[in-house]
Amino acid sequence: MLVKKHNTFCNRFALLLALSLITLAACASAQDTVDSVLRPPKGSQVAIVVFEDLQCPMCRRTAPLVEQASKTYKIPVIRHDFPLPGHNWSYQAAVMARYFDTHSKALGNEFRDYIFENQLEVNPANLRSYGEKFAAAHKVDLPFVIDAGGKLSALVNADRDLGKAIKLEHTPTVYIVSTRNPSKPFVEVKDNSQLYLTIDAVMKD
Protein backbone atom coordinates (compact mmCIF):
# COMPACT_ATOMS: atom_id res chain seq x y z
CA MET A 1 0.00 0.00 0.00
CA LEU A 2 2.85 2.37 0.87
CA VAL A 3 4.58 1.53 -2.40
CA LYS A 4 1.39 2.33 -4.33
CA LYS A 5 1.01 5.69 -2.54
CA HIS A 6 4.67 6.45 -3.19
CA ASN A 7 4.26 5.70 -6.90
CA THR A 8 1.15 7.87 -7.07
CA PHE A 9 3.01 10.74 -5.40
CA CYS A 10 5.94 10.35 -7.80
CA ASN A 11 3.63 10.31 -10.80
CA ARG A 12 1.86 13.46 -9.64
CA PHE A 13 5.15 15.17 -8.92
CA ALA A 14 6.46 14.25 -12.36
CA LEU A 15 3.28 15.57 -13.98
CA LEU A 16 3.47 18.86 -12.06
CA LEU A 17 7.13 19.22 -12.95
CA ALA A 18 6.39 18.62 -16.63
CA LEU A 19 3.56 21.15 -16.60
CA SER A 20 5.79 23.70 -14.86
CA LEU A 21 8.51 23.24 -17.46
CA ILE A 22 6.00 23.63 -20.29
CA THR A 23 4.65 26.82 -18.69
CA LEU A 24 8.15 28.23 -18.23
CA ALA A 25 9.01 27.41 -21.84
CA ALA A 26 5.83 29.11 -23.06
CA CYS A 27 6.56 32.22 -20.98
CA ALA A 28 10.13 32.33 -22.26
CA SER A 29 8.91 31.95 -25.84
CA ALA A 30 6.37 34.76 -25.37
CA GLN A 31 9.06 37.03 -23.91
CA ASP A 32 11.37 36.19 -26.82
CA THR A 33 8.57 37.22 -29.19
CA VAL A 34 8.05 40.54 -27.40
CA ASP A 35 11.80 41.20 -27.37
CA SER A 36 12.12 40.46 -31.08
CA VAL A 37 9.13 42.57 -32.16
CA LEU A 38 9.31 45.56 -29.84
CA ARG A 39 12.79 46.75 -30.65
CA PRO A 40 14.23 49.32 -33.07
CA PRO A 41 15.74 48.14 -36.36
CA LYS A 42 19.49 47.79 -36.55
CA GLY A 43 21.19 51.17 -36.56
CA SER A 44 18.41 52.98 -34.67
CA GLN A 45 18.05 53.64 -30.96
CA VAL A 46 14.39 54.64 -31.07
CA ALA A 47 11.56 53.67 -33.41
CA ILE A 48 7.78 53.61 -33.70
CA VAL A 49 6.15 50.20 -34.04
CA VAL A 50 2.56 50.12 -35.28
CA PHE A 51 0.09 47.25 -35.61
CA GLU A 52 -2.70 48.41 -37.91
CA ASP A 53 -5.79 47.32 -39.81
CA LEU A 54 -6.37 49.10 -43.12
CA GLN A 55 -10.14 49.13 -42.54
CA CYS A 56 -9.87 50.57 -39.02
CA PRO A 57 -11.06 54.21 -38.77
CA MET A 58 -8.76 55.02 -35.86
CA CYS A 59 -5.82 53.54 -37.79
CA ARG A 60 -6.67 55.92 -40.63
CA ARG A 61 -6.53 58.89 -38.26
CA THR A 62 -3.36 57.71 -36.53
CA ALA A 63 -1.25 56.92 -39.61
CA PRO A 64 -0.50 60.53 -40.67
CA LEU A 65 0.30 61.50 -37.07
CA VAL A 66 2.80 58.65 -36.81
CA GLU A 67 4.31 59.58 -40.18
CA GLN A 68 4.73 63.20 -39.12
CA ALA A 69 6.30 62.14 -35.81
CA SER A 70 8.72 59.94 -37.73
CA LYS A 71 9.80 62.91 -39.84
CA THR A 72 9.97 65.29 -36.88
CA TYR A 73 12.17 63.03 -34.76
CA LYS A 74 13.93 61.33 -37.68
CA ILE A 75 13.08 57.88 -36.35
CA PRO A 76 11.85 54.88 -38.36
CA VAL A 77 8.34 53.46 -38.38
CA ILE A 78 7.83 49.69 -38.43
CA ARG A 79 4.35 48.80 -39.67
CA HIS A 80 2.75 45.43 -38.95
CA ASP A 81 -0.45 44.00 -40.37
CA PHE A 82 -3.16 43.12 -37.88
CA PRO A 83 -6.36 42.67 -39.92
CA LEU A 84 -9.34 42.16 -37.64
CA PRO A 85 -11.76 39.28 -38.30
CA GLY A 86 -14.78 41.58 -38.21
CA HIS A 87 -13.56 43.63 -41.19
CA ASN A 88 -14.52 42.34 -44.61
CA TRP A 89 -11.76 43.72 -46.85
CA SER A 90 -8.79 44.61 -44.62
CA TYR A 91 -7.10 41.22 -45.01
CA GLN A 92 -7.10 41.40 -48.82
CA ALA A 93 -5.91 45.00 -48.65
CA ALA A 94 -3.00 43.88 -46.45
CA VAL A 95 -2.13 41.15 -48.98
CA MET A 96 -2.24 43.76 -51.76
CA ALA A 97 0.05 46.03 -49.73
CA ARG A 98 2.46 43.13 -49.37
CA TYR A 99 2.47 42.80 -53.16
CA PHE A 100 3.53 46.43 -53.51
CA ASP A 101 6.14 45.78 -50.80
CA THR A 102 7.79 43.37 -53.25
CA HIS A 103 8.55 46.35 -55.49
CA SER A 104 9.73 48.49 -52.58
CA LYS A 105 8.80 48.91 -48.94
CA ALA A 106 8.22 52.60 -49.61
CA LEU A 107 5.70 51.76 -52.34
CA GLY A 108 3.91 49.31 -50.05
CA ASN A 109 3.61 51.92 -47.33
CA GLU A 110 2.43 54.50 -49.85
CA PHE A 111 -0.32 52.06 -50.86
CA ARG A 112 -1.31 51.63 -47.21
CA ASP A 113 -1.61 55.39 -46.85
CA TYR A 114 -3.55 55.56 -50.13
CA ILE A 115 -6.05 53.02 -48.79
CA PHE A 116 -6.39 55.00 -45.56
CA GLU A 117 -7.07 58.16 -47.60
CA ASN A 118 -9.83 56.37 -49.52
CA GLN A 119 -11.00 54.12 -46.69
CA LEU A 120 -14.53 55.52 -46.52
CA GLU A 121 -15.14 54.63 -50.18
CA VAL A 122 -13.37 51.25 -50.29
CA ASN A 123 -15.41 48.06 -50.09
CA PRO A 124 -14.87 44.39 -51.03
CA ALA A 125 -16.28 44.96 -54.52
CA ASN A 126 -14.04 47.90 -55.48
CA LEU A 127 -10.82 47.17 -53.56
CA ARG A 128 -9.27 45.63 -56.67
CA SER A 129 -10.15 48.75 -58.65
CA TYR A 130 -8.35 50.95 -56.11
CA GLY A 131 -5.35 48.65 -56.34
CA GLU A 132 -5.34 48.93 -60.14
CA LYS A 133 -5.55 52.73 -60.02
CA PHE A 134 -2.64 52.87 -57.58
CA ALA A 135 -0.58 50.45 -59.67
CA ALA A 136 -1.23 52.39 -62.88
CA ALA A 137 -0.31 55.69 -61.22
CA HIS A 138 3.02 54.18 -60.18
CA LYS A 139 3.59 52.29 -63.46
CA VAL A 140 3.48 48.91 -61.75
CA ASP A 141 1.70 45.81 -63.05
CA LEU A 142 -0.95 44.31 -60.78
CA PRO A 143 -1.38 40.61 -61.63
CA PHE A 144 -4.87 39.15 -61.92
CA VAL A 145 -3.89 36.70 -59.17
CA ILE A 146 -1.86 38.72 -56.71
CA ASP A 147 -0.84 35.92 -54.35
CA ALA A 148 -0.73 32.75 -56.42
CA GLY A 149 1.76 30.98 -54.16
CA GLY A 150 0.31 32.19 -50.87
CA LYS A 151 3.57 33.83 -49.79
CA LEU A 152 2.00 37.25 -49.27
CA SER A 153 -0.84 35.83 -47.18
CA ALA A 154 1.75 33.99 -45.11
CA LEU A 155 3.48 37.30 -44.35
CA VAL A 156 0.20 38.90 -43.27
CA ASN A 157 -0.61 35.85 -41.14
CA ALA A 158 2.85 35.96 -39.55
CA ASP A 159 2.35 39.61 -38.56
CA ARG A 160 -1.09 38.85 -37.16
CA ASP A 161 0.35 35.93 -35.18
CA LEU A 162 3.02 38.24 -33.75
CA GLY A 163 0.29 40.58 -32.58
CA LYS A 164 -1.56 37.73 -30.95
CA ALA A 165 1.65 36.52 -29.30
CA ILE A 166 2.19 39.90 -27.62
CA LYS A 167 -1.49 40.00 -26.57
CA LEU A 168 -2.68 42.81 -28.82
CA GLU A 169 -6.21 43.89 -27.95
CA HIS A 170 -6.99 46.65 -30.45
CA THR A 171 -5.89 48.54 -33.53
CA PRO A 172 -4.03 50.66 -33.90
CA THR A 173 -1.53 49.65 -31.26
CA VAL A 174 1.44 52.02 -31.25
CA TYR A 175 4.68 51.49 -29.34
CA ILE A 176 7.72 53.67 -28.93
CA VAL A 177 10.61 51.22 -28.73
CA SER A 178 14.14 51.97 -27.61
CA THR A 179 17.51 50.46 -26.81
CA ARG A 180 18.39 53.40 -24.56
CA ASN A 181 16.82 52.02 -21.38
CA PRO A 182 17.04 48.20 -21.06
CA SER A 183 14.65 48.23 -18.09
CA LYS A 184 11.96 49.94 -20.19
CA PRO A 185 12.46 48.91 -23.84
CA PHE A 186 9.00 49.91 -25.06
CA VAL A 187 6.07 52.15 -24.12
CA GLU A 188 2.57 51.90 -25.59
CA VAL A 189 1.03 55.15 -26.80
CA LYS A 190 -2.57 54.86 -25.64
CA ASP A 191 -3.68 58.31 -26.75
CA ASN A 192 -2.60 60.06 -29.96
CA SER A 193 -2.28 63.33 -28.06
CA GLN A 194 0.52 61.71 -26.04
CA LEU A 195 2.57 60.55 -29.05
CA TYR A 196 5.15 63.34 -29.03
CA LEU A 197 5.35 63.47 -25.24
CA THR A 198 5.99 59.73 -25.14
CA ILE A 199 8.75 59.96 -27.74
CA ASP A 200 10.32 62.86 -25.81
CA ALA A 201 10.26 60.84 -22.59
CA VAL A 202 11.77 57.76 -24.23
CA MET A 203 14.53 59.78 -25.88
CA LYS A 204 15.46 61.38 -22.56
CA ASP A 205 15.85 58.03 -20.75
Regions found by a protein language model. Name each.
Residues 54, 60-136:
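Structural alpha/beta surface segment adjacent to cysteine/selenocysteine redox centers
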Residues 53, 87, 121, 146, ...:
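Charge-dense, low-complexity intrinsically disordered segments
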Residues 132-205:
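C-terminal cap of thioredoxin/glutaredoxin-like
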Residues 39, 102, 118, 146-147, ...:
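Short N-terminal micro-motifs specific to bacterial/archaeal maturation
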Residues 2, 9, 13-89, 151-170, ...:
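Extracytoplasmic thiol/disulfide redox context detector
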